[in-house]
Structures are given as C-alpha cells and as structure tokens.
Amino acid sequence: MTREIKPLFGTDGVRGRANHEPMTVEMSVLLGKAVAGVLQECKPGRHRVVVGKDTRLSGYMFENALIAGLTSMGIETLVLGPIPTPGVAFITRAYRADAGIMISASHNPYWDNGIKIFSSEGFKISDVIERRIEQMVAFKEFGNLPEDYAVGKNKRVVDAMGRYIEFAKATFPRGRTLNGLKIVLDCAHGAAYKVAPSVFEELDAEVICYGCEPTGSNINDNCGALFPSVIQKAVIEHKADVGIALDGDGDRIIMVNEKGHIVDGDMILSICANDLKKKGILHGNRIVATVMTNFGVLKYLENVGIDTLISPVGDRHVLQNMLEYEANLGGEQSGHMIFLDYNTTGDGIVSALQVLRIMIESESTLSDLTSPIVKSPQALINVAVKEKIPLDTLPLVQEALRDVRSSLGDSGRVLLRYSGTENICRVMVEGLKKHQVDSLAKTIADIVDSELGVGIIE
C-alpha cells in the first residue's frame, strides 16, 4: 500500500493559521529535521542554517520548534530575530550558510504564519527540494540522529539588523544622500519596523513613521502595502515628497507620489526598467513581469524599447524566468521587485532606494516619473472562498467568464485565479472604460461568491 504524501508547500512556502495544520509546533520540528536531512543528503557533514522571523506572536514558538528540529540533527542555527525576508536571503549568503529560513506569512493577517526556505545562494528552494522535504516529513525518514556530543548549537546574530541596514544603504550611490526629502513610511508593524526607518534616516531623509509599533497581533492590520490609503492621507497631511508602504515581511512595496496617488509595482518596475536601460545596464533590454501587469504599462515599456517577458503570478515564477532569460530586473503589480544585481528575492527597502535615486538624479518628482505611463482601466476584486474548487468545473462561473469576454471583445481581458497563499479568488478585468470593467468584475465576483464564497473583501 502506497503511503500518501501530503502537500505542505504552496506558492510561497508553507503557510496557514498558527496552531492549525500545517502550521503547528509539531510540524515545524519535523520541517527542521527535514531541512537538515536534505542538507545531509546533498553534502554530508556539518551545516549552518540562518533563521529569521517577522513580528507575529506565533513566531516565537515556530522559531524554537524549527531550531529544535535542526539542532537535533546536528545543524548549527544562526538566529536573527525580526528581520525582513530579503535580510534572511542576504545574511544566508554573507555567512556562507547552507540554508536560510524565514518565519512569516508575509501580507497575511497576524493569525497566520508561514515558513519560507532559501538555498545557500539566497534563492527560494526548488520544487524538487520541496517535494523531498514533504516526503521526509510524511515518512519521518530524516536520516540517522547524531550522537549526543554532535547535536547542533544555537547562536544569536546580535548585529543582524545592522548588517542588513548597511547592505541596503550600499545599493544607494556613495556620495549621494536623501537630504531634503520628506518620506512617509509605513512598515505594517512588521519585520522592517526597525531597519527601514534606520536606512532612510541614515541616508539623511526626514522620515515620518507609521506601522512601526508591533504588538505581535497588529501586523498588516489596516496598514502596510495592502492598505496604502494610510500613506495616501499622510503624504497630503505632511506635505511629503513620497510615501512608502511595505508588507509584513518587507519583500514588497507600494509607493505614493507627492499628490497622494498610488504608484504600484507595475509603475515602479517601469520607472526602474527605463532608468537601467538608459544607463545601459538592463540585461538584454528585457524585464520579467506577470499576467497581472497592466496593458498600458506593457505598451509604455514597448514604446521605450524594453522587451517584457510574462510569467505566472508569484515572485518565484518571476525569478525563475529572470534566471532562465538572464534578466536582472523583474516584478509584480503587487509590489514584489527583484533587482538581481543586489539581492536574490523581492526587497521593498532596496526597491524604494532605487526609485528615490532616480528621483534625485533626474531632479524629478515621483509624479513626473510616472506621467508618461498611461494605465488601462483595471478592476481587481478579491472573493474569500471556503475551498479552492477548480474553476473550470463551475458552470455558472464559466458562463459568466464567456459573457464578460464577449462583452470586452478584443479591447480587454479577464483573469480569474486563486491566490497561492490564501483562500481567495481574484477577479481581474481590464478594458477601455473604467465603469465597464468595474461592472463586469463585480458580475463575476458576485457569481464566484454565490458558488464558493464567504464574502467579497473590500
């Protein structure tokens, strides 16, 4: 009889509600053992693993559980404490560690948590390695336990934040500062709550902080990259030059210009791509974007001579395409920006610094930089669902999709997909007229909600 291997990994690691399967202490111990087992399979001997986390209350128990699993298998753990996900990727490389683990559910509510695993090079592990970890966990076959004298040690890296701060600052040109810029910064009460203000302040910006007082249960709570209205209002109130909103683990960014208008990942990607092309350092004059990228943005990129490779949604898919096609810039509308010249994963702070550098070098406001980009009207509605039933098996949903596509003709498009990290169905409609796409998106969302949902998320 074949034993079933239960999938643990989604599109961005293991994720779920804390103290519910799969995010339990028991599972975390097993995952720690499995990571150790994979490392031993790849290269027998002593190994070191970096462990970081965001500010969720449950991070403490998962941190200890992972360390227990790892050290029981002879792994030395280097504990960073609260630090952005890109900080874990950076320090994994800097310490020549064999792997890195980030305990975070990214933009999800505080009651969720997750585990992201990085290779020694700072890249998220491959599907093959994920399947091997799942196999080890399912069969509890991790290899031989070491003798009592060979279990691993646990060390705290006391200057982890400082190291990442200096790394981030080093991506900004020497001799330049942010002097004269007033920045509204929202850290979502998350992993970047200390490092992000320090980076911008040490570069001599005036920083007005929001979302920098984590309690363990307020991460992403009506703040951060998913709720840019906070910094929209604050930028106007404080007459700031720019607003920067990060998510709970600091790997994505949404910006706001001096007029209080949102500058999303599509716009940030376009600004940075055009700048790198002008400097002659955009590899192959190509970037990687996703199926969610606005058509107007794609048209702008085409007009300035930049080829855009389209990947599925998810920073892992973006990165895979970047590596395959040797691109050094890629990103998503949601705010994941990957600058491979600097880091191996999305990095909100580094992305912000690149936009600020362009503003300073060109003596432009953020609204000046985005003014040539005319986005197509687009509507995005999120529907919370009870379970992710294959959408192509739902006749009413498929009928609605056919009707909407017929209404749009060749002048628009519709995308319907499940989130890879939450029980959410995303409805995206793009077309020529705002009122039309809003109406059509709501039509589909209402039908999805009636078939599967527990409510439309405002």
Swiss-Prot record:
PROSITE patterns: PGM_PMM
Family to which this protein belongs: Belongs to the phosphohexose mutase family.
Modified residues (Phosphoserine): 106
Cofactor, free-text remark: Binds 1 Mg(2+) ion per subunit.
Protein name, entry field: Phosphoglucosamine mutase
Keywords: Isomerase, Magnesium, Metal-binding, Phosphoprotein
Name of the gene encoding the protein in the UniProt record: glmM
Catalytic activity annotation: alpha-D-glucosamine 1-phosphate = D-glucosamine 6-phosphate
Record flagged with keyword Nucleotidyltransferase: no
Entries under InterPro entries matching the protein: A-D-PHexomutase_a/b/a-I, A-D-PHexomutase_a/b/a-I/II/III, A-D-PHexomutase_a/b/a-II, A-D-PHexomutase_a/b/a-III, A-D-PHexomutase_C, A-D-PHexomutase_C_sf, A-D-PHexomutase_CS, Alpha-D-phosphohexomutase_SF
Mod. after translation: Activated by phosphorylation.
Binding site for Mg(2+): 106, 247, 249, 251
EC number(s) from the headed UniProt entry: 5.4.2.10
Pfam families documented for this protein: PGM_PMM_I, PGM_PMM_II, PGM_PMM_III, PGM_PMM_IV
The protein's role, per its UniProt record: Catalyzes the conversion of glucosamine-6-phosphate to glucosamine-1-phosphate.
Cofactor(s) needed for function: Mg(2+)
One GO term (biological process): peptidoglycan biosynthetic process
Catalytic residues identified in the record: 106
GO (cellular component) term, any one: cytosol
CDD domains named among the record's database cross-references: GlmM
Gene Ontology molecular function: any one: phosphoglucosamine mutase activity
